[in-house]
Amino acid sequence: MERTLMAAAAHAALAQPWSWLLAPLSGAVEHHIADWTAWHARLMVLGWGTLLPLGALAARFFKIVPGQDWPEQLDNKAWWHAHRVMQYAGVLAMTMGLWMAWGLGTGHGAAAQLHAWLGWSLCIAGWAQVAGGLLRGGKGGPTDARLRGDHYDMTRWRIGFERVHKSLGWLAIALAAVTIVLGLAIADAPRWMAVVLALWWSGFVAAFVMLQRQGRCIDTYQAIWGPSAAHPGNRQPVVGWGVRRYTSAAWRARSGRP
């Protein structure tokens, strides 16, 4: 009898928070959502809530990977491949999410209209980022087929691309978080979704702050060609907030190598 009562008490204790997590944000008894809305939300969260932020994180903080003997080992393309794959996949998921909702949204409230405007802005930003990447210009440099190139010479075209690409990308990620929160509220999503997304975004911000403080946001130019002033781009100011440059000695000291 005592064991039965203890089991019942444990079940009740576990059922209460679980029921709270499964309940909609409004506290309604039931939650109903159209299939197209559910798939729209899943694809947008996959794209703008997961893949695109991770791709941006890889590009900002992993141009030199742990254990890489920079500047003896230059141009590690792991970050580039990760960034490109996740950005293309994220924009594809975004586009499919837009297609799922095309012509089906009927919300006329202020929150729904704001969500729609932000959503369209994010789609335009995503497509613009892909187009900008394709039009970023040539690479150049000692290891390329041609020495002269937009990136190696840091031409005005390349500088403009970097300024727009970096600022638009991070602004879009911040707006995506707001848009996703609005979507959860409009759909009256289960509370567990809000909890999971809150934990995810908190972890993302914490990782960003930690990596930034560690000085891992390294100039792309230096990561590719090294710190020598013989390379023209190293004689120009860095592009972007919080971007670091290192001498060979400073990087070795930071990495704990002699």
Per-range role (PLM):
Residues E2-P258:
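Membrane-embedded alpha-helical bundles that constitute the cytochrome b-like, heme-associated redox core
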